[in-house]
């Protein structure tokens, strides 16, 4: 027991004289490690009588706890001193401005789509989506586009095989809606479309929004009124708008819509017309009872006109210097 008492006193004295955490850890190993001085005393248990063993074992455990408690106390003291020294060495100038994070912003094409959806949503139009990989019936046949129409040519359309292609327009969404829902219908279908073209005003992938209204006694005057209001709302100006006759296989009569630009020239912005009876028949709607109108617009085209962008390709080059202008 005398030897144990001396070892504990030596350990406590060493802990008191320790200068840092490393020295404390060395002391812990020297006295409490597997080969430490206090641990080695347990080997004496074999030389003791049955009556002495419990008392000696208890004394060794008490010694361990005493040394461990002193080590823990001293370690906390050193950690506190280290933290205090670190804080004293670090100086913070509270007058410096904070580190700001740039807020993200919507892509200009997304802004335009949301603006279009908002306007037509207030008129009762719902947003419909459809597949971007389309079959020839929904992309061409049901839209009254003949087998020999130029739009079906390989140089205009990306084909997977003669019957399957990347959609060239979102009109297929209108066909699918009319196949599954009964009139009255009011829908718009925004989405990506694909055509084999690439220059300052065309890219192989771009965005369209097409609209469809089918009901009884629908007429061209309603179409003109809605599109006229839309264009004035979108450009936030009292624009001059004109409708001029045109041709689309899926509408009859058909028109293209122009607005007067700031340079005094007419600018084409969208196409429209009354839904062709053949299109209604292809989806099982009686053209004698129902009529409708449809319209389609290129999102990038409208965005270019609204923001004065000259090159459509800039929307897809991910240049932050360009995109940050629309935040």
Swiss-Prot record:
Keyword Nucleotide-binding: yes
Record's subunit section: Tetramer of two alpha and two beta subunits.
GO molecular function per UniProt: ATP binding; magnesium ion binding; phenylalanine-tRNA ligase activity; tRNA binding
Protein name: Phenylalanine--tRNA ligase alpha subunit
One annotated Gene Ontology cellular component of this protein: cytoplasm
UniProt-listed InterPro entries: aa-tRNA-synth_II (IPR006195), aa-tRNA-synth_II/BPL/LPL (IPR045864), Phe-tRNA-synth_IIc_asu (IPR004529), Phe-tRNA_ligase_II_N (IPR004188), Phe_tRNA_ligase_alpha1_bac (IPR022911), Phenylalanyl-tRNA_Synthase (IPR002319), tRNA-bd_arm (IPR010978)
Cofactor list: Mg(2+)
Main subcellular location of this protein, as a coarse class: cytoplasm
Biological processes per GO annotation: phenylalanyl-tRNA aminoacylation
Top-level enzyme category: ligase
Family statement drawn from the similarity comment of this UniProt entry: Belongs to the class-II aminoacyl-tRNA synthetase family. Phe-tRNA synthetase alpha subunit type 1 subfamily.
Residues given in the record as Mg(2+) binding sites: 252
Reactions this protein catalyses: tRNA(Phe) + L-phenylalanine + ATP = L-phenylalanyl-tRNA(Phe) + AMP + diphosphate + H(+)
Subcellular location: Cytoplasm
Source organism, top-level taxon: Bacteria
Species the sequence originates in: Shewanella amazonensis (strain ATCC BAA-1098 / SB2B)
């Amino acid at each position: 027991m005398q030897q144990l008492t001396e070892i504990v006193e030596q350990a406590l004295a060493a802990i008191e004289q320790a200068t840092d955490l490393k020295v404390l850890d060395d002391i812990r190993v020297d006295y409490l490690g597997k080969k430490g001085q206090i641990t080695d005393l347990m080997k004496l248990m074999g030389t003791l009588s049955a009556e002495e063993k419990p008392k000696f074992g208890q004394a060794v455990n008490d010694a361990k706890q005493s040394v461990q408690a002193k080590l823990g106390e001293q370690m906390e003291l050193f950690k506190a001193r280290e933290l205090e020294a670190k804080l004293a060495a670090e100086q913070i100038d509270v007058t410096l401005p904070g580190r700001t994070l740039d807020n993200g912003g919507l892509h200009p094409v997304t802004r335009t789509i949301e603006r279009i959806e908002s306007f037509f949503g207030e008129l009762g139009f719902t947003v419909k989506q459809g597949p971007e990989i389309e079959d020839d019936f929904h992309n061409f046949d049901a839209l009254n586009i003949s087998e020999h129409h130029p739009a079906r040519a390989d140089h205009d359309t990306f084909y997977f095989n003669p019957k399957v292609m990347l959609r060239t327009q979102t009109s297929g969404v209108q066909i699918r809606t009319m196949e599954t829902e009964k009139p009255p219908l009011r829908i718009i279908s925004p989405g990506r479309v694909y055509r084999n073209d690439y220059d300052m005003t065309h890219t192989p992938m771009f965005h369209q929004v097409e609209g469809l209204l089918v009901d009884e006694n629908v007429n061209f005057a309603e179409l003109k009124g809605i599109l006229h209001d839309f264009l004035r709302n979108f450009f936030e100006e009292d624009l001059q708008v004109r409708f001029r006759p045109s041709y689309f296989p899926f509408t009859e009569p058909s028109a293209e819509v122009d607005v007067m630009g700031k340079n005094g020239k007419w600018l084409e912005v969208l196409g429209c017309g009354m839904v062709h009876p053949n299109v209604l028949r292809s989806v099982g709607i009686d053209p004698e009872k129902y009529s409708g109108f449809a319209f389609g617009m290129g999102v990038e085209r409208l965005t270019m006109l609204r923001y004065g962008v000259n090159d459509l390709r800039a929307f897809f080059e991910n240049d932050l210097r360009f995109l940050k202008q629309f935040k």
